[in-house]
């Protein structure tokens, strides 16, 4: 039995009746209307609780929660550079470990969190994250993936999906938007031998919170890739964030799964998938795509999903009902 399996063998998850009341991230922040990322952040931090130290990369969640002299954070929180959240949390975790060992402090149960957007994770901060995972620091990393550099003007990242129009991959007469496929950061984390890796979305809050709680219980690094709708950048309605996130799962564009000690477990089997065209429809960043391009994307989604299913040693018995 691996270290994650051992840590989680008696795991008891959240449900609607046992939802924690604690709010480490307070209301009154400055997120855009309909922001899916801050909702995901709130859900994740409710699952973690208050005995934590958080290291935040520069990005949307840093900007909207910490305009000096105000803060939305009710826990120790450190703002660091775009690229080094994982490096900083490594140092914080090591410092706490040393101070506990030397009896300078008596705080053995602190959960160490680092987070960033897709740009800070998959691009600018990937080297620091890779190093932290390889060294085996005891921390949880959240990637809040809104599929572009939204904070600085909706520029494409390596997590921007194929065909999406951004300010640096604009659709036009000679371009169909983003020309490369989305980088699979969850599987990159798995390739590092990370004990616990998962995907989540705020459209399924209990699933997200249970995965975050599991990650916090595993000794060693854990990585959670959280799909985070951005109405501003995706050009969908401010009331459509959760519906778009749900459609991403139902269309197999963003599968929900977890990897425990290298074993893949599908969290939600999509028995009757919806076409990717239905997922694209609310988002004007995809409105330029032709039927042929949509079918091209559909074929790729189908292939990637089947690859994932074949990796899974256990599939959740629950079928997609929607």
Regions found by a protein language model. Name each.
Residues 15-19, 28, 107-108, 158-214:
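Conserved thiamine diphosphate
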Residues 155-162, 205, 212-219, 236-247:
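Short, surface-exposed, charged loop/turn segments at secondary-structure junctions
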Residues 143, 198-200, 223-227:
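Short, conserved beta-strand edge motifs with alternating hydrophobic and charged residues
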Residues 3-141, 154-164, 178:
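Cofactor-binding active-site loop characterized by glycine-rich and histidine/acidic residues
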Residues 61-62, 146-151, 231-233:
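Short gly/pro/ser/thr-enriched loop/turn and capping motifs at secondary-structure boundaries
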């Amino acid at each position: 039995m691996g270290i994650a399996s051992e840590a989680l063998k008696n795991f008891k998850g959240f449900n609607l009746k046992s939802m924690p009341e604690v709010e480490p991230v307070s209301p009154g922040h400055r997120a855009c209307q309909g922001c899916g990322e801050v909702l995901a952040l709130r859900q994740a931090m409710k699952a973690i609780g208050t005995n934590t130290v958080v290291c935040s990369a520069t990005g949307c969640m840093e900007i909207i929660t910490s305009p000096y002299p105000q803060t939305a954070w009710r826990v120790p929180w450190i703002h660091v550079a775009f690229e080094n959240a994982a490096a900083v949390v490594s140092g914080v975790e090591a410092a706490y470990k040393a101070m506990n060992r030397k009896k300078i402090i008596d705080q053995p149960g602190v959960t160490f969190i680092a987070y960033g957007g897709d740009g800070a994770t998959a691009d600018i901060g990937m080297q620091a994250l890779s190093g932290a995972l390889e060294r085996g620091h005891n921390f949880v990393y959240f990637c809040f993936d809104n599929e572009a550099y939204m904070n600085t003007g909706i520029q494409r990242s390596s997590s921007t999906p194929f065909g999406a129009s951004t300010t640096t991959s604009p659709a036009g007469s000679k371009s169909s938007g983003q020309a490369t496929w989305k980088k699979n950061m969850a599987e990159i984390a798995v390739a590092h031998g990370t004990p616990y890796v998962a995907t989540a979305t705020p459209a399924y809050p209990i699933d997200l919170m249970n995965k975050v709680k599991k990650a916090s219980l595993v000794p060693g690094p854990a990585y959670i890739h959280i799909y985070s709708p951005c109405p501003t950048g995706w050009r969908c309605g401010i009331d459509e964030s959760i519906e778009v996130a749900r459609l991403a799962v139902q269309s197999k564009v963003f599968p929900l799964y977890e990897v425990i000690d290298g074993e893949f477990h599908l969290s939600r089997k999509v028995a009757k998938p919806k076409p990717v065209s239905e997922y694209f429809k609310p988002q004007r960043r995809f409105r330029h795509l032709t039927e042929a391009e949509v079918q091209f994307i559909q074929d790729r989604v189908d292939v990637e999903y089947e690859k994932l299913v074949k990796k899974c040693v256990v599939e959740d018995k629950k079928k997609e009902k929607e």
